[in-house]
From Swiss-Prot:
This is Aspartate 1-decarboxylase. Pathway: Cofactor biosynthesis; (R)-pantothenate biosynthesis; beta-alanine from L-aspartate: step 1/1. Catalyzes the pyruvoyl-dependent decarboxylation of aspartate to produce beta-alanine. The modification Pyruvic acid (Ser) is found at S25. Its EC number is 4.1.1.11. PANTHER family: ASPARTATE 1-DECARBOXYLASE (PTHR21012:SF0). The keyword Lyase applies. The lineage of its organism: Bacteria, Bacillati, Bacillota, Bacilli, Lactobacillales. GO terms for molecular function: aspartate 1-decarboxylase activity. The gene is panD. Pfam families: Asp_decarbox (PF02261). SUPFAM superfamilies: ADC-like (SSF50692).
Amino acid sequence: MKVTMLKGKIHRAKVEQAELDYVGSITVDMDLLEAAGIYEYEKVQIVDVNNGNRFETYTIAGERGTGMICLNGAAARCVSTGDKIILMAYCELNENEVKDHRPKVVFVDDNNKVERVTSYEKHGRLSDIIL
């Protein structure tokens, strides 16, 4: 049996742009994709923290070091510039692989620069976890 598990996550990144007249996807700074172990063109789930929208798209690598998070095409209607989003990619594992699996969780600062990468998310308030 296969189990779907969190593979990589970019937590509370700020939407820098939303481009409606663009072929669909989300453009993400390549530094963030690599830190989270997410590939270009990989299917991802996006959750908008500000409005609660959840949707799926795929990634396009953005320029390194820019902090770029840009929703493109129809996905641009699901967010507003300045919103905080959570971007997640998943993988399917065999049951015997689940016990040893650890996702990559990337926390970013206000400029979408990598602040911390961990393989563990403890339950708690953001202020308690990040500081």
